[in-house]
């Protein structure tokens, strides 16, 4: 986030997380203090002329706050409802000021790209969906949990190879992709690549 802040001329960033995740909030708060003590945050980032600070904010956990303008309303202490666009947050966002809104996946990709280069990052994935993505596998599977993989694996590979198939040994009839507002994919669509464009086509 500090890199993104310096790149855009921002001096402060906010990490917005749901109040239902106290361990994540505590971990992030500790990480901010460590970064501040190491000079990565503060009035002179890494000894440079750039200042950047991070504040952790917790929200009430409304699902709609995953949408950027609703998130901004919540950050401002308002009800988490979607704002009309335009104006876009890049022009008029948090407290009416130009605002960059990124998810943690985008921000986590920045150091890898800066260290290894864009071509290295582009080697992972397919089409317009490049790099890696964290996926959570839950339910009747042998190996549930959080995994990081490149875009492009099929749903079948994710369920059968990474997840190990079902814990009960019964055949998989369908999987839900994308959380509460996602879609169900039957077994006959398990050849679908884990890729934004491929999902949009299905």
What kind of feature is each model-predicted range?
Residues 100-101, 107, 195-202:
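Short, intrinsically disordered, charge-balanced linker/junction segments flanking boundaries
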Residues 16-18, 57, 138-140, 149-150, ...:
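Generic beta-strand/beta-sheet core signal
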Residues 25-151, 163-166:
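Hydrophobic alpha-helical positions that pack around
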Residues 12-32, 54, 167-201:
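Terminal amphipathic helices with adjacent charged low-complexity linkers/tails
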Residues 3-5, 136-138, 200-201:
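Short, flexible, solvent-exposed loop/turn segments with mixed acidic/basic and small polar residues
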Residues 2-4, 150-168:
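Short amphipathic, charge-patterned alpha-helical segments
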Residues 2-24, 108, 114:
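Internal alpha/beta scaffold segment
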